[in-house]
């Protein structure tokens, strides 16, 4: 019998205000009763604005935060965001000319930006787009992503994981995961029970980019023992995919959609998107397929997504993304079970 998990999609009403509109390759995070959103593209490879959009779950309205302090100077796509306490952290991304952005924080109480790290300099992380991001109370974790070259000779995609110590304001790198660990962009990253989980992503082939592929591997780094482990999962496994939506719900990593076959024109084309969802139990290592309730979902990838607690439940928040005909949407959804 196939393993399934019943949940419900809720389409979030957007009642007004200066909304971000249709876009993909953007990022978002929740602090309290507000969601913060940044970056993205409407046409493939062309960035949009550099506003920080704020959605208020109490009123279901959008606003734009005043760019107070050391705000990002570059409008970018492939950027990532995570919340720690009352601050959000924004890492990387690029514009259509492959100018790359840096590392910033935004204090949601003071409503003020702060520049933290100039990327691509000695002894700091190299600039990149489409990495994966996660955090615990003390650290921001960045895995993989697409390189621009930087100060060192790098692969087209990274397989390294870099760590920002929030209290000290310093960067370090986790141990090398070994030769069999795939360099990837557009992967999922989550911290659960002192383990840093890496899920799926678009991987480098051994033939130098000709046969790059979407992976469905799952690995974790044990933050206590300092070791990388590749796990064997069972159940109803997802196919290989990248740039999917994901969130942590309890001990489960929930994923939705994503690109399952790359377009022959790369990022410029529509690719083949999925409309399936899955949940991985990180204790039993069993995948279950999500049975959708509520709003029917279209194949979708390249969304902004995060874990959020709204309507009294914790679940997956997802905005925008690329649809099957290479169009972008501004739909806003919440999934929980």
Curated annotation (Swiss-Prot):
Protein's recorded name: Phenyl-N-(sulfonatooxy)methanimidothioate sulfolyase
Matching Gene3D superfamilies: Kelch-type beta propeller (2.120.10.80)
Cofactor(s) in the UniProt record: Fe(2+)
Catalytic reaction(s) noted: (Z)-phenyl-N-(sulfonatooxy)methanimidothioate = benzyl thiocyanate + sulfate; (Z)-phenyl-N-(sulfonatooxy)methanimidothioate = phenylacetonitrile + sulfur + sulfate; (Z)-N-(sulfonatooxy)prop-2-enimidothioate = 2-(thiiran-2-yl)acetonitrile + sulfate; (Z)-4-methylsulfanylbutyl-N-(sulfonatooxy)methanimidothioate = 5-(methylsulfanyl)pentanenitrile + sulfur + sulfate + H(+)
Ligand binding (a (Z)-N-(sulfonatooxy)alkanimidothioate): 46, 94, 130, 151, 186, 202, 243, 269, 299
Domain of life: Eukaryota
General function of this protein: Specifier protein that contributes to constitutive and herbivore-induced simple nitrile formation. Catalyzes thiocyanate and simple nitrile formation from benzylglucosinolate in the presence of myrosinase. Converts also aliphatic glucosinolates to both epithionitriles and simple nitriles.
Recorded name of the encoding gene: TFP
Effect the entry attributes to changing residue 243 to C: Reduced activity
InterPro entries noted in UniProt: Kelch-typ_b-propeller (IPR015915), Kelch_1 (IPR006652)
Organism: Lepidium sativum (Garden cress)
Entry EC number(s): 4.8.1.7, 4.8.1.8
A Pfam family that the UniProt record links to this protein: Kelch_KLHDC2_KLHL20_DRC7
Residue stretches of each Kelch repeat: 34-82, 87-133, 139-194, 203-248, 252-307
Positions annotated to bind Fe(2+): 259, 263, 267
Listed result of changing residue 267 to A: Strongly reduced activity
Keywords associated with the record: Iron, Kelch repeat, Lyase, Metal-binding, Repeat
């Amino acid at each position: 019998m196939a393993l399934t998990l019943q949940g419900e999609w809720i389409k979030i009403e957007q009642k007004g205000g200066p909304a971000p509109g249709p876009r993909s390759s953007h990022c978002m995070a929740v602090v309290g009763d507000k969601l913060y959103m940044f970056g993205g593209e409407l046409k493939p490879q062309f960035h949009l604005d550099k506003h920080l959009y704020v959605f208020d779950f109490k009123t279901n309205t959008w606003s734009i935060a005043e760019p107070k302090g050391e705000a990002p100077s570059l409008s970018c796509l492939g950027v990532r965001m995570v919340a720690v306490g009352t601050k959000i952290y924004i890492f990387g991304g690029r514009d259509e000319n492959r100018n790359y952005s840096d590392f910033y924080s935004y204090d949601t109480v003071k409503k003020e930006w702060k520049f933290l790290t100039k990327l691509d300099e000695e002894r700091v992380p190299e600039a990149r787009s489409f990495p994966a991001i996660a955090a615990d109370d003390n650290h921001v974790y960045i895995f993989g992503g697409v390189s621009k070259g930087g100060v060192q000779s790098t692969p087209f995609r990274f397989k390294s994981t870099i760590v920002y110590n929030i209290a000290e304001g310093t960067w370090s790198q986790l141990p090398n995961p070994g030769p069999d660990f795939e360099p990837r962009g557009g992967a999922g990253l989550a911290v659960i029970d002192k383990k840093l989980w890496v899920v799926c992503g678009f991987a480098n082939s051994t033939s130098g980019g000709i046969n790059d592929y979407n992976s469905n591997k799952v690995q974790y780094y044990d933050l206590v023992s300092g070791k990388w482990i590749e796990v064997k999962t069972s159940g109803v496994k997802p196919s290989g995919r990248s740039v999917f939506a994901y969130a942590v719900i309890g001990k489960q990593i929930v994923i939705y959609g994503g690109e399952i076959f790359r377009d022959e024109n790369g990022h410029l084309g529509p690719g083949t998107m999925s409309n399936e969802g899955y949940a991985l139990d990180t204790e039993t290592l069993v995948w279950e397929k999500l049975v959708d309730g509520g709003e029917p979902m279209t194949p979708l990838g390249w969304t902004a997504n995060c874990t959020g607690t709204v309507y009294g439940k914790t679940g997956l928040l997802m905005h925008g993304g690329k649809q099957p005909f290479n169009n972008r949407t501004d739909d806003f959804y919440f999934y929980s079970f």
